[in-house]
């Protein structure tokens, strides 16, 4: 899931985007839990996951708007 490019996301179907978002949300939950317990080493991964979710949601919205 790490470092998804916009072109890679655009090539995904809506179902694949939903699965990617779900996976990233689970990863983000685990990262937050690790941060709270002091086990998180790569703190920047939290920010990356949040931004990847936003990137996928934005492209999904653009695709839906283009269909109309």
From Swiss-Prot:
MF terms (GO), sorted A to Z: structural constituent of ribosome
Matching Pfam families: Ribosomal_L29 (PF00831)
Gene Ontology CC: cytosolic large ribosomal subunit
InterPro entries, A to Z: Ribosomal_protein_uL29, Ribosomal_uL29, Ribosomal_uL29_CS, Ribosomal_uL29_sf
Keyword Ribonucleoprotein assigned: yes
One of the GO BP terms on file: translation
Signal peptide: none
Keywords noted in UniProt: Ribonucleoprotein, Ribosomal protein
Family assignment from sequence similarity: Belongs to the universal ribosomal protein uL29 family.
NCBIfam families in the cross-refs: L29
Protein name: Large ribosomal subunit protein uL29
Origin organism lineage: Bacteria, Pseudomonadati, Pseudomonadota, Alphaproteobacteria, Hyphomicrobiales
